[in-house]
């Protein structure tokens, strides 16, 4: 970011390009995914239980072209997590179960022809692949030169709006450790997993500059908001 843009931000004329984690589900014991993720269990064994609070909401149904769903606190907070987001970053596991070099372009994600992002999505991977344009405005870009490059590209694509780190756990941990996340919204589900991918093992949020902003009790999850500063 250049000196002039920084000065304009201080004057309130340029929006701050926040990098955030939004509506990320964790268990009471701190796991963000279950163990043994595979094609049958993309969120790990029992991982779907973390997201029960979200699956029933109106915003989730709408994102997947369905009608109905519950309204209320959980729905409103989930909907807010998508506001002003103009680019996403995902790990390869979030995109799919394929390992190693891409044999072909047949795998196009877990979400069908119209993924729920509707923005550019930058997928971290060690193996190159051409961009994949989908229905509804989503284009997957496969980034092979690291998390900072992915963030730079996402910020450029977002054009001053927010970048959301979608996960999985490993990617969020990497961005946290690198000091590149500004704020987080965690949806704490009333679930004890006991095993899986732990979100904060070995990470000190206070040392990274995070403070608790607020907590909100939803119908099926407790929403915890933290940010730097």
Segments and roles (model prediction):
Residues 2-229:
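Enzymes that bind and transform nitrogen-containing heteroaromatic metabolites
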